[in-house]
Design a protein with these regions (language model features):
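Residue patterns forming the tRNA-binding/recognition surfaces of aminoacyl-tRNA synthetases
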Residues: 1-83, 142-146, 152-154, 167-370, ...
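Amphipathic alpha-helical
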Residues: 5-39, 109, 113-135, 140, ...
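Protease-associated
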Residues: 79, 83-89, 94-171
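C-terminal low-complexity, glycine/proline- and small-hydrophobic-enriched intrinsically disordered tails
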Residues: 533, 537, 655-853
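Acidic, turn-prone loop/beta-hairpin segments
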Residues: 21, 29-36, 559-584, 597-601, ...
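Secondary-structure transition/capping motifs at alpha-helix termini
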Residues: 7-12, 152-153, 189-205, 279-285, ...
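Conserved phosphate/anionic-ligand binding catalytic regions in large, soluble enzymes, centered on
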Residues: 4, 72-91, 295-296, 300-302, ...
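Alpha-helical recognition segments enriched in aromatics with Gly/Pro capping
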Residues: 50-52, 147-149, 153-165, 176, ...
Length: 853
């Protein structure tokens, strides 16, 4: 805090802050039971003086306002549109108070708004607004008021259905030219004046052009109402859409059509109009929380304007540094990065002191305590030296260097953490200080800060700001990871509902490793994870099965062989080496669900395929041991105890698995993508053959029911298949690929669709209904596999040779008497299949023809 103060990052002055009147101090995020992340929203309070009360209102208030001016106060975010006021709205069912603002003025608004005003010195006394009278909104209807800055000097108060007591002041100034809500309500009132119990003359003023936009002209609201087909003020969904469109278009693209700032962009005119109104005494600055905020003491919070110490977050240069860190820091997901960016855009002047509670005293102003979130942003750096400074968890016992807390002065900390000069006035031995600095330099910057997503709006963003302020760039954080909350069986954990589980309960129920496995499976990232009982239960069996497999395979036996590796051996080895590399990438990215998938599920799938496809000759004993060793190493971060047991007791490896190296291949290893592709091809082709036979079985059943013969009988004693392999793609596909390749932009990674269509049309290919679906499929492949792989369209292996190696397994698995692998040309010359079926064959996707010999 001292160094931030020295750097002028902490300042003192009047500012808006969320404040708890009951607690008598600012209410920051960790002091709230509701409304975390909420901050002040600043409005312009428009003072609309009462000219003539409605008869009902006059009777209700009596003589309480004698000698004072009375103003209806509206809170607006668009002061630049006040030139176009045609009326004012109130909610007929809402309660409005007449509050004494000062000796000469009375303000009409909701109690909630008056309470906020009282803590901003708008209404006196400061902490207790005096309510002189109360009125239902329905009684105010028909009151004539002044409309400051409007071309219509006087307007009437009218009813509106959507006015909220929880937002603004409960009084809404109406500008129907630019507010869709105002225009829709005004039209409703004109159509049904009798229903709404108003005099038609009160709603007679037409919308006034205030600003001009390129899209909607000078009547933004009427145009949007017509375009979106909004029928009344009850169409809240489309009105919300229209409101957003109107505000964005008006603020960013609009120019003023009226008043002193006519012709000026709205973005520039808005603050000037506001200032003019305030200087003329026709308006004032007003703020309130942007959402409902409740303190932990149960108090509804307000926005207070007060002198206080604050961290100058949002200051231009400091913010630029924070953005620089965010740009280079790994956030592990775009959602997390966008969340940080959003916070940096709104975070501004954070109150860093309070009057009571837990916390350290503010060093230069000890009447205040440091707010809890403000001094918890660089404590990670303390972890790097804490073991040298104290020998117990509480810090009450000196550490091995024998340094006491009072010796750790600001100058000493500068030397240790900020590469400052050697503190000549310190009585700590130089050797000890050097050890502290060395320990910090060795461990910092932090590689990762993992925390909840709810801390992005405060703690984590504060850590970004304070690290760039206090540390040189080489010590800036390398990454921050935000995670969601943990649900239990798809529902939010809550003691009140009984859907609650502690870590100790989980360990007692499922054991440590099964619990860890279920937690890894629960999910990663910023979305909420889900711990599932069924996964935890299944994990126990899965781990016992894993131990059993390793024990059985380690014992050896006649089922294993030795000698040279076969093709299936090489495919299997390449697959688990590749899965080890993939798992490593997932662990490094802290994606534990994906790591579990590749480390356990996909690895065991590869083993199962290998075991089945080598049923005749058996698995290779050396390869199985290498696989088991790799498998337990991959699983060690998730299931350390089971992995340790298998490593030492079953595999008889030396030392602990915790000190073993990751199973990276040797430096001489050369990846073989052709083997990976062949493995995927074999599994995919077998599935295609199964699916094809199932389809034939369904057709047979259907024809049998209709009394017709079937060409192939899956139940026959003798069954065979011809697998027909194509050496080249159809000409229309080759033509399409060539056209796409010419239309591909390497810089943007996109296809020029117009160019593709032009070339297809020129070659007469557009009429072929197969073309466009094929092109869309290739676009997806480009996104998934890259342009080079998609355009190359060549298999990395010999399809015929791989299929011939697979023949024994195909026969066994599908219970076939014969399997023939042939080329398209061979199939045609021998009439091994109908021509229509042969034509379906493509490289990587053979045609399948079942028959009964």
């Amino acid at each position: 805090m001292n160094r931030l103060h020295d750097l002028d990052k902490i300042k003192f002055g009047m500012r808006y802050t969320i404040y708890s009147p009951l607690d008598g101090q600012p209410c920051m995020d960790h002091d709230r039971s509701e409304g975390e992340g909420g901050g002040p929203t600043e409005y312009t309070g428009i003072k609309m003086e009462v000219v003539q009360w409605s008869k009902a209102a006059l009777e209700a208030i009596g003589n309480v306002v004698e000698g004072k001016k009375v103003f209806l106060v509206a809170a607006t975010l668009r002061p630049e549109t006040m030139y176009g006021q045609t009326n004012c709205f109130v909610g007929t069912t809402l309660d409005y108070g007449l509050f004494s603002a000062n000796d000469e003025e009375i303000y009409v608004c909701s109690y909630r708004a008056a309470r906020n005003m009282a803590f901003q010195d708008i209404i006196r006394p400061r902490d207790n607004p005096v309510k002189l009278a109360e009125l239902k909104g329905s009684l105010i209807i028909g009151t004539k008021i002044k409309a400051p800055f409007s071309v219509n000097p006087e307007v009437y108060v009218l009813p509106m259905e959507g006015v909220l007591a929880s937002k603004g002041t409960g009084v809404v100034t109406s500008v129907p030219s630019d507010s869709p809500d105002d225009y829709a309500t005004l039209m409703d009132l004109r159509k049904k004046a009798e229903f709404y119990k108003i005099d038609p003359e009160w709603a007679a003023l037409d919308p006034v052009p205030v600003l001009s936009t390129p899209t909607y002209g000078e009547m933004t609201a009427p145009v949007l109402i017509k375009q979106l087909k909004i029928q009344s003020q009850k169409d809240t969904v489309r009105l919300a859409e229209a409101k957003e469109l109107a505000y964005k278009e008006g603020f960013y693209k609009g120019t003023m059509s009226i008043g002193e700032f006519k012709g000026m962009p709205v973005e520039e005119a808005k603050p000037r109009v506001r200032q003019k109104m305030i200087e003329a005494g026709l308006a004032f600055a007003y703020a309130e929380p942007d959402r409902f905020v409740k303190s932990r003491s149960g108090d509804e919070c307000v926005v207070a304007l007060m002198d206080q110490w604050y961290l100058d977050y949002g200051e231009e240069k400091w913010k630029a540094q924070a953005e620089k860190l965010l740009e280079r820091m790994n956030t592990y997901s775009s959602e997390t990065k966008h969340a940080f960016e959003a916070v940096l855009n709104w975070l501004n002047k954070w109150a860093c002191a309070r009057t009571y509670g837990l916390g350290s005293k503010l060093p230069w102003d000890p009447q205040f305590l440091v707010e809890s979130l403000s001094d918890s942003t660089i404590y990670m750096s303390y972890y790097t030296v804490s073991n040298l400074l104290h020998s117990d968890m509480t810090g009450s016992k000196p550490g091995p260097l024998g340094i006491t807390p009072d010796q750790m002065t600001d100058e000493v900390w500068d030397y240790v953490l900020a590469s400052g000069p050697f503190p000549s006035n310190s009585d700590i031995p130089k050797e000890s200080l050097q050890k502290l600095r060395h320990s910090f330099d060795y461990f910092y910057p932090m590689d990762i800060r993992s925390s909840g997503k709810d801390l992005i709006p405060n703690h984590l963003t504060f850590a970004v700001y304070n690290h760039v302020a206090l540390f040189p760039e080489r010590h800036w954080p390398l990454s921050m990871r935000a995670n969601g909350h943990l649900m239990l069986n798809g529902k939010k954990m809550a003691k009140s509902t009984g859907n609650f589980l502690t870590l100790r309960q989980a360990i007692n129920k499922w054991g440590t490793d099964a619990t860890r496995l279920a937690l890894a499976d629960a999910g990663d990232g910023i979305e909420d994870a889900n711990f599932d009982d069924t996964i935890a239960n299944a994990s126990i069996l899965r781990l016992h099965t894993l131990i059993g497999w390793c024990q059985e395979s380690a014992d050896g036996g006649s089922g294993y062989r030795t000698g040279d590796f076969t093709y299936h051996d090489r495919v299997f080895q390449e697959e688990f080496i590749n899965l080890a590399a993939e798992t490593k990438r997932h662990y490094e990215a802290t994606n534990y669900k994906d790591a579990l998938k590749s480390a356990l599920y996909e690895t065991l799938m590869a083993r199962d395929w290998y075991r089945e496809v080598t049923f005749e000759e058996g698995m290779h004993s050396d390869l199985v041991r290498q696989f088991n060793r790799t498998l337990v190493l991959l699983m060690a971060p998730i299931t350390p105890h089971v992995s340790e047991h298998i490593w030492t007791t079953v595999l008889k490896e030396e030392g602990s698995i915790q000190t073993a190296l990751w199973p990276d291949p040797p430096a001489s290893y050369q990846p073989c993508p052709d083997l990976i592709a062949a493995g995927q091809y074999m599994r995919g082709t077998l599935k295609t053959m199964r699916d094809a036979e199932i389809l034939l079985m369904k057709k047979k059943a259907k024809k049998g029911a209709q009394g017709g013969p079937a060409a192939y009988d899956p139940a026959a004693e003798k069954k065979a298949v011809n697998v027909i392999v194509a050496n080249r793609f159809p000409a229309w596909q080759d033509d399409s690929i060539e056209i796409m390749q010419r239309a591909y932009d390497e810089k943007t990674g996109t296809i020029d669709d117009a160019k593709v269509k032009d070339e297809l049309a020129a070659k007469g290919l557009l009429k072929d209904k197969r073309i466009m679906p094929f092109i869309q499929l290739q676009k997806k492949r480009i996104a998934q596999l890259g342009a080079a792989s998609t355009f190359r369209r060549q298999l990395l292996f010999s399809e015929v040779e791989v299929l011939k190696l697979l023949i024994p397994y195909i026969k066994k698995n599908l219970k076939l008497t014969d399997v023939s692998v042939m080329t398209v040309e061979e199939a045609r010359s021998s009439s091994a299949a109908p021509d229509t079926l042969i034509e379906q064959s493509e490289p990587g996707s053979p045609a399948i023809n079942f028959y009964n010999p």
